[in-house]
């Protein structure tokens, strides 16, 4: 909308346009930029300013619109029209939605530093003393960070689901090999997700030197096993929760962290990847890329089945390249992240 052109024609903003503009005042600058670029955001990804800040913005907009309209409009009723719009804006109260009360869903830098440094094998603050358990739990956190998979998908991973630097997610409902009382199931679509070389090497070490030395682990295909009680049996959902509970108790900065929070953080990373990798393309094209990459990486059903059919390989390649580039950029400069 060109305000100058509209006002010169004695056309003020409609009530709907005014309300949309004022609603926009409630978002942070970063959120506004993402919306203007055409990036699709999940509800929890919206970040909101304080009510006072929103009110200050609205006041400034009200004064500017009144000034500009009186300056450019030619209508004899411009005073009354400007007054009506100003009163409409003045009576507006910024909307504060429950999911937007400045709740940060993504992992903080402090939390990431703790996970990637203090959970390393042999670190003096590592809450687990057994080396096999240290390595297994580091893998749990690292795989969740790099892939954003669900806890059920994590617990369902087979050793052979990880080949080289690719993790494959499969749906195995009614699996005859499943012996756990609470069977973990994949709720999302099957997909392949790339991981970094460092994480792939660490998984190989765990499988060959730690899991491989446990006799009972050879009786089933699951990647993660117990190294104490029920030695060698597949790791349960409850056991994964206990890992996170121990981490939260050991490090106050990890308060509120859970497997699902890594999934939220993955969406945050995807948004950043799209912004960085496609900053020079048109907003409509960026939104289209978002609609292809995000559903695939997260295992969601695509909006268009035809698009999925014809662009599946392209989507996989683009998603993989972007994800690996982002992960490698993150690990660069963090010395000994995957030290063994």
Protein language model features and the residues they cover:
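N-terminal core-binding DNA-recognition domain of tyrosine recombinases/integrases
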Residues: 1-98, 122-127
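Short, charged phosphate-coordinating catalytic segments
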Residues: 70-74, 144-166
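DNA breakage-rejoining catalytic core of tyrosine-based enzymes
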Residues: 94-120, 179-197, 215-220
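Basic, Lys/Arg- and aromatic-enriched nucleic-acid-binding interface segment
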Residues: 117-151
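Short, basic (Lys/Arg/His-rich) helix/loop patches that form interaction surfaces
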Residues: 126-127, 241-296, 300-304
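Conserved tyrosine-mediated DNA breakage-rejoining catalytic core shared by Y-recombinases
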Residues: 156-201
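Active-site/catalytic core of tyrosine-dependent DNA strand-transfer enzymes
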Residues: 197-256, 272-273
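Catalytic-site neighborhood detector that most strongly recognizes the C-terminal catalytic loop/helix
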Residues: 296-329
């Amino acid at each position: 909308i060109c305000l100058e052109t509209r006002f010169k024609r004695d056309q003020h903003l409609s009530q709907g346009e005014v309300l949309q503009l004022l609603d926009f005042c409630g978002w942070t600058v970063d959120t506004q930029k993402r919306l203007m670029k055409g990036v699709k955001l999940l509800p929890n990804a919206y970040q909101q300013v304080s009510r006072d800040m929103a009110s200050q913005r609205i006041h400034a907009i009200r004064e500017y619109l009144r000034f500009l309209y009186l300056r450019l409009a030619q209508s004899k009723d411009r005073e009354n029209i400007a007054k009506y719009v100003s009163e409409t804006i003045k009576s507006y109260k910024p909307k504060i939605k429950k999911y937007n009360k400045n709740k940060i869903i993504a992992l903080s830098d402090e939390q990431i530093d703790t996970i990637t440094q203090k959970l390393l094998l042999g670190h003096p603050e590592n809450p687990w003393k057994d080396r096999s358990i240290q390595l297994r739990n580091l893998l749990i956190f690292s795989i969740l960070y790099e892939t954003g998979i669900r806890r059920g998908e994590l617990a369902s991973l087979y050793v052979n689901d990880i080949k080289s630097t690719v993790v494959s997610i499969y749906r195995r409902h009614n699996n005859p090999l499943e012996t756990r009382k609470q069977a973990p199931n994949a709720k999302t679509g099957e997909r392949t997700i790339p991981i970094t070389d460092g994480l792939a090497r660490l998984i190989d070490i765990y499988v060959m030197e730690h899991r491989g030395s446990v006799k009972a682990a050879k009786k089933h295909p699951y990647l993660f096993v117990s190294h104490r009680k029920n030695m060698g049996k597949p790791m349960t959902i409850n056991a994964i929760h206990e890992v996170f509970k121990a981490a939260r108790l050991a490090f106050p900065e990890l308060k509120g962290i859970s497997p699902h929070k890594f999934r939220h953080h993955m969406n945050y990373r995807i948004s950043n990847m799209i912004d960085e990798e496609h900053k020079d393309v048109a907003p409509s094209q960026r939104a289209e890329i978002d609609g292809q990459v995000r559903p695939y990486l997260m295992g969601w059903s695509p909006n268009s089945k035809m698009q999925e059919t014809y662009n599946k390989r392209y989507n996989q390649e683009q998603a993989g390249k972007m994800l690996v580039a982002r992960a490698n950029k993150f690990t660069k400069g963090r010395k000994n992240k995957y030290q063994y």
